[in-house]
Amino acid sequence: MEGNKSMQREKIDRPMKRGPEQNSLSPPLAKCPFMSCSSLKTLHSLYQGSFPFYRLPSEVGHFSLDENRQYHQDNRKLRYYSPPVGIREKGSPGWNVMDGYESHYVRRNEDEKEGLLHILTWLEKNRGVLGAHVEGGSKRPIDRDFVTWRGHLTKILCTPYETQEGWLLAVTLFKGTFYISEQETEAAQKKRKERSLEQERLMYSGYKFESYICADSPDRQPSQSAVVNTNEGFCSVLLARLTSHSLLISGEVDCTDPSAKKSIPPTCYIELKSSAQIRNPHQQRSFNRYKLLKWWCQSFLLGIPIIVAGFRSPEGRIVSLETFKTSDIPHLVRGERNSWDPAVCMNFCNKFLSHIKSVVTRDDPRLVYLFAWEPGCDVTFTVHTDPEYTILPSWYVNSVN
């Protein structure tokens, strides 16, 4: 999202800061740009109620991205959970997750915006998997209402409780299917460009943590001296349903558990996380409010049942491991002051998807509806035909046509 933008865009992208007086998870009041009758409110109290129907995802495919970020229709980059014996739970391994930052770290180029590229590549190579759906006398080549990344849905789920970072989501309706792709806001780009060395090292530490407990095959041990290359990844492609909305979701999977009782994906997958060591009640409350919210959203959406977290000392060493069951996380925060409610997250997501269906009415691969939100505001949208906003490349459009 480069170049000159209107004053409206500049207002959308202005970051909001959490001050010490903001103890509630409710977004602060803000002066919001271009409110309209087609806007969607995000106040969490509006979405309280029973948990909506969500059919847990079933995996229909997968793909790998190699060290050069090239797509492969296989599982060559799937890793296997292999923690050292004796420290699977509550251990103190002492791993140095800053080790290798200067010499064994290959960063993905974050200036190259991939959008939906890899999902669309999978769809183009697996057209027969989804079949065709007859609706109103016409066939949909992709038998899903929505196609998107897990990370985009995570942002939507967290919106009622988010107090700092806004988002931009581009939506195109093509052949009866809505494609959702995140656009980087100017505030997010500025934040990324201005990361400190400490922030860069903390990002690295999460990847390095994974290298201590993941092996390349079930019969191998983790290689602690391996190069950390963030170009690499294994992604699952899954089908799910939220009330009336059928979804095709793809998300990166950290590893699979070869000892899992159920070996069918995604129930055998494990999400790996690292976080700062919790040393006092204030840090525990902050962890429960913000980290556990995002962790739950990420894992629940893909149907990943287990999260293994490594807690990091100020010196950069893993001092403890803890396993969380995704289904238990909402119970851990229930009853806490200013806590979050998973039903609110899912109800808002359901409403937002319905909102998209109500306003994105023109079926045109060149047309983009850009939904914008910042804390304290309603979700609004603008419509664009400029090529810079296009999210469906011509090769994909031609393959579907």
From Swiss-Prot:
Coiled-coil region: none
Main location: nucleus
Record-level Gene Ontology MF annotations: 5'-3' exonuclease activity; magnesium ion binding; mRNA 5'-diphosphatase activity; mRNA binding; nucleotide binding; RNA NAD+-cap (NAD+-forming) hydrolase activity
GO-annotated biological processes: mRNA catabolic process; NAD-cap decapping; nuclear mRNA surveillance; nuclear-transcribed mRNA catabolic process; nucleic acid metabolic process; RNA destabilization
Superkingdom, taxonomy of origin: Eukaryota
Gene giving rise to this polypeptide: dxo
Organism in which the protein naturally occurs: Xenopus laevis (African clawed frog)
The name this protein goes by in its record: Decapping and exoribonuclease protein
Single GO cellular component term: cytosol
Positions annotated to bind Mg(2+) 2: E210, E252, D254
Subcellular location(s) of the protein: Nucleus
